Amino acid sequence: MKSILVGLSLVLGLFVSGYGQKSKIYSEFAGEGEDRIEIIVVSGTPHQMGVELGRHLKNQARQSMEKYLHSAQKEDSVLCSLKNLLLAWKTNEPFMDKRFVEELTGFSEGSGIDLNFLKAAHAIPFISPYSCSGVDAWGKASGNGHLYQIRNLDYSTDAGLQDFPVVIVYKPTKGIAHANIGFSGMLSSHTGMNSKSIVLGEKGESPSAELPYDLHGKHFTILFRELLYDAKTLSDVERIIENSSLIKRYYLFVGDGKLKKGAAVKYLISTPDSVRFHKWRDMDKTDIHVPKVYNDITYYTMKNDQASKFFDEHYGHIGAPEMIKLSKLVASDGNLVDVVYDATSLEIWVANATDTQTASSREYVHIDLKKYFK
């Protein structure tokens, strides 16, 4: 599968701050038809990048976030009321990375979208239950020693997010260049990778029975932006996660794709319990949540038995095509977006749902992030 670039969008912008710093933005497209994805590259300070992204995305971001918020409120008008969402944001904001808050503020200024509206939309994942799939395979498990990751996001297409897919590549004045795979107007991260080959994915595990959730801590969608900015190694990722106050329950799949150092860790964040997190590496026989453990593989999917059978059949020969097959195999019926990473070569394959088909039924569009990280 090769990247199909459809022209360079004439959206090059330039912003000069009072300190002489410059921010730039441009975009181009990968994929065709309903599978087309906009790739936006932006540089500058967090606030500057937010302003530029807001200017560039203002029309589609407004549509995207309005649909998203309307869908959440239609599903649960009390839980997702504007008052409740803003309270959730206010409770959680002291734990947020300041760069993210600065970017969101800039996005509001650039787009003209009310900041409280954006805060409410970004708070929906804080208070909502969800489920997904995650896999890391590297070393002896892969055919070339590269580290591959799957991140399947299983979320309702009723929210319409699939109509607004974007890959935003950030090149901050301070921090590591990184890619956030998501949707117009959504600046938090459900998955991403940085130029140091750090790759991040998640599987939700918070049951609705535990509502309302305690929000006094970092939510993974904001934590991921912090990790993408700052983590150069897997050890950095582990240190930041383990020294952070976290919330809710979810699995985190974190990996470092650098050759000879490639490895991954699976976390179960369980902050409502006395033991607030569990950590497993490959071949950890204490991992009772999967039917079988393997060298150089960590996983937890919606269909673990099928995933294990797949590993038995393809072990030692796993590459991007095999991971795409596995992503399709373990996808649920409500499958919004799937991402396959080669964290070693800094490539991704992204599939987004349409109004009539799940992401796993669509084309996995190839994007080589190396060219954008330069």
Which residues fall in each region the model found?
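Bacterial Sec-dependent N-terminal signal peptides
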Residues: M1-K22
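General secondary-structure propensity
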Residues: G7, F224-L227
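A generic structural signal for short, solvent-exposed coil/turn residues
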Residues: L12, A141, T173, G192, ...
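C-terminus-biased signal that marks the final domain/tail of proteins
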Residues: Q21-S131, L228-K374
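Gly/Pro-rich interdomain helix-loop hinge
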Residues: E109, H216-G217
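Internal mixed beta-strand/loop scaffold within catalytic domains of large alpha/beta enzymes
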Residues: A123-D214, I222
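Internal, well-ordered alpha-helical segments in soluble enzyme and binding-protein domains
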Residues: F220-L223, T233
